From Swiss-Prot:
It comes from the Bacteria. This is 6,7-dimethyl-8-ribityllumazine synthase 2. It comes from Brucella abortus (strain 2308). Disruption phenotype: Cells lacking this gene are not auxotrophic for riboflavin and grow at wild-type rates in both rich and minimal media. But simultaneous disruption of ribH1 and ribH2 is lethal. The ribH2 mutant shows a decrease in survival and replication in macrophages at all time-points and is attenuated in mice. One of its GO terms (biological process) is riboflavin biosynthetic process. Pfam families: DMRL_synthase. HAMAP family: Lumazine_synth. One of its GO terms (cellular component) is riboflavin synthase complex.
Amino acid sequence: MNQSCPNKTSFKIAFIQARWHADIVDEARKSFVAELAAKTGGSVEVEIFDVPGAYEIPLHAKTLARTGRYAAIVGAAFVIDGGIYRHDFVATAVINGMMQVQLETEVPVLSVVLTPHHFHESKEHHDFFHAHFKVKGVEAAHAALQIVSERSRIAALV
């Protein structure tokens, strides 16, 4: 499926957020939306989609990419070691799935799916990752603007 990015200043980005550790993941979304608004004067529309966990992000991203409505898609989740399963397997599956979606649909899929080596339900860890997700949201906004711009530039060459 060949989908070109919009060749205009106004476009849409889908933001898919996992609801596990929502209080932390929400910080990425809030800073992402705020940074896009600050950088574009509100010309970029962000549509928010909730999924139960990180594992559901790739399928949701693929479904949204196929609509042709979005110049880019962002997935955000916090995959931690809960002591029951190997969280790194889940994170790898999610990231690989997101990569596959963008390669198949030609819609950029950006990741704010973070997997710490260790996370403990302590105030110190919570505060650290709360702040870290804010930073990652801003970084994702910059990356989204850059990749949409570059994709538009490439589309103009074809």
